[in-house]
Amino acid sequence: MSNHDDLAFDLRPIRHRDCQAIWDILKDPQVQTFNDYDADITKGNVYDFIQGDIERFYNQQGIRLVIVLRSSGQVIGSVGIFNIIDGQGMLGFELSSQYFGKGIMQKVLDMLFEKLTTFVPAPLNSVLALVNQNNSASIKLLTKCGFQEHDAHWVKYVS
């Protein structure tokens, strides 16, 4: 199996049994550097976040998808669009630090926006992302994916 095949992934809706994998990712100091979750996040907090993600999906206010490696079934991150109000949503994502710099998140975002109407039932005109100004990797990623800097946000128009 080639290295490329090892990084092939699928996206699927998050579920409660993903709690441990997501918690492990969020506890990683390299992930915490630019993430907006508290450093002392508990597994219970993550379970509650997942419950909220599931409820937002059913209320057509967002979706969170996990990134699953095809080769192993391992959850290596998540991506979501949430707080969908009046055609505008917020983007959030995290990736296991083991996979930083491998181009996975760009492929994830490309897939998310390519299949947006499949993943997000609510109509969307734009997606915003809040990024720490020191997070050059995420800024580069968002730029490659068509986001534009606007005030303190990064914006992608999708309609």
Show the residue positions of the predicted features.
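Short loop/turn motifs at secondary-structure junctions and domain boundaries
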Residues: 55-60
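Conserved GNAT-fold acetyl-CoA-binding loop/helix
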Residues: 30-52, 63
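Generic structural signal for well-ordered alpha-helical scaffold segments
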Residues: 51-54, 117
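Acyl-donor (CoA/ACP) binding surface of acyl/acetyltransferases
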Residues: 1-28, 64, 68-159
